[in-house]
Amino acid sequence: AATSAKEMLRQTFDVELTKTRTWLQERRVTFNGDAKLTQLYNTNLFFCMFFSTGITLDTEELVLVTSRSPRYYVSAAYWDRDSLLWSFPAILDADPERAKEMLSYVFGRQRRNFGIHSRYIDGTVLEPGFELDELVAPLLALERYINKTDDKSILSDTDIVQCISLI
């Protein structure tokens, strides 16, 4: 964090602000003629992008979380439903590459406990109990990804093939 802060200072505030605004604008979704819907959608989109995913400090691995907000009672826990049925669709609209990374995490790190109510970010059980929506959420997200991107090559990924047969 300290090194990143020093680099941002070197780049100057104006440069960093311009880069940030450009990044946000490239991912912004517009609904023609409906400013209120555009604002609401993008508020939700960027909340999903910034509060439902994170990069671990130790391995720099993308992880999905129910929320990174400290106001949420299970902050930094993982639920398939929240990550894949609520956050994933918006992120897929704005950043298909990030969405593909999300699927890689889900079908990799989280696969051993598909269907379990909630888990830690390493895939171990947090709160036990089977829930059908938690079980099928990875498949629904995968289908949505393929329909949106037409990237059928993802179906040859070994982790995904194994998970589909497991489910």
Regions found by a protein language model. Give the residues of each.
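Acidic/polar, glycine-enriched structural segments that form the non-catalytic walls/loops
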Residues: 1-77, 153
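Aromatic-rich carbohydrate-recognition surfaces in CAZymes
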Residues: 8-9, 13-16, 73-167
